[in-house]
Amino acid sequence: VTPKVLQPEELKNYWRDIKPGLEKVLLNTPTASWIPEDVYSAIQNRKAICVLGIEEEEVVGFFVGYPQANSFFAWAVWSQGDLSEGINHLLWYAKEVGCRKVIFQSDRKGWARVLRKYNAYPHTWVMEV
């Protein structure tokens, strides 16, 4: 799998591959407060970055996010198969843009299992009032 940093002017060409992945992320994350079109707008307006995973000219995964201070906030991560390679690309990209850590928020319990081998730890606690 080869990572490809998507340029905003290329987004229309790849949206048919990205949107279904975002919809799958949303199906598994019922507390998410965004829709795929929010992601489209953020990429198009250079507020977010999308890195595709390309294999044999096909999109097999992607992540969307943005740098903030010394961290890279991963907004959405999707892969057709094992997430390990995509996570490795995410860590590589974060380092490339000068970030020292990757952060994201999810209420999906499966992330604890996936991220254990990366020495990741829970980062956000929420108290509703």
What are these regions (language model features)?
Residues 22, 26, 43, 90-98:
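Hydrophobic, Leu/Ile/Phe/Ala-enriched alpha-helical segments that form helix-helix packing faces
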